[in-house]
């Protein structure tokens, strides 16, 4: 299995220099290496746009509901090696136009929320914005994966405004609760841990934990709903 790219629990890192190995690899497979570097910069800008939008929504909802629906925001730019491997799996040559056209998850933003209802509230608010276009939606909260994974996945197109042009870039967004994120993080560590075989028994135990996590989220949503009712009654 191919190890997933890592999300960083912080604002997007500054641009790093390519290693000599990366330069040789991509200069051999991708003649327009400087153009590739520019494309990655565009994706970084798209990540910043989406991250800013969620920060603004978080600020607005904190004023409206007296709490922050977003616990944290993580960002990820797919590594050069991951891009090359994914293009190979698709049977496609390493060309800029094909990379941009066929890989929808080069730029990634993960939003961790307190409650399941927050996930859908943030989704609705984001998709109402004029410069956001929904391309693809997969609701693994309503329909979890077989292994128990839960999260809401969106692929959106966002406009970025440069000095002399406007571009539309694709960004993958994952929205999930703290419980969903904890489970996914632990599952990933166990599944890809070096020198340890991932057994069927471990998979079954993780599936059981995923069900407990879903029950926890449901109870937290119920408590949140009751708190809203109680607050309304006091007014």
Which sequence ranges carry the predicted segments?
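Surface-exposed peri-terminal alpha-helical interaction modules
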Residues: 90, 106, 116-119, 157-158, ...
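Glycine-rich, often proline-containing surface loops adjacent to acidic residues and nearby aromatics
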Residues: 101-110
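Short linear motifs at secondary-structure transitions and domain/linker junctions
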Residues: 24, 30, 50-52, 83-89, ...
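Long beta-strand-rich cores associated with HINT superfamily self-processing modules
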Residues: 100, 113-220
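Sparse, context-dependent recognition of short Cys/His-centered cofactor- or disulfide-binding micro-motifs
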Residues: 21, 28, 35, 68, ...
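Active-site acidic/histidine clusters and adjacent loop/turn architecture
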Residues: 32-83, 88, 92-97, 105
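Generic detector of short, locally flexible boundary/turn motifs and exposed helical patches
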Residues: 13-17, 38-39, 48-49, 72-79, ...
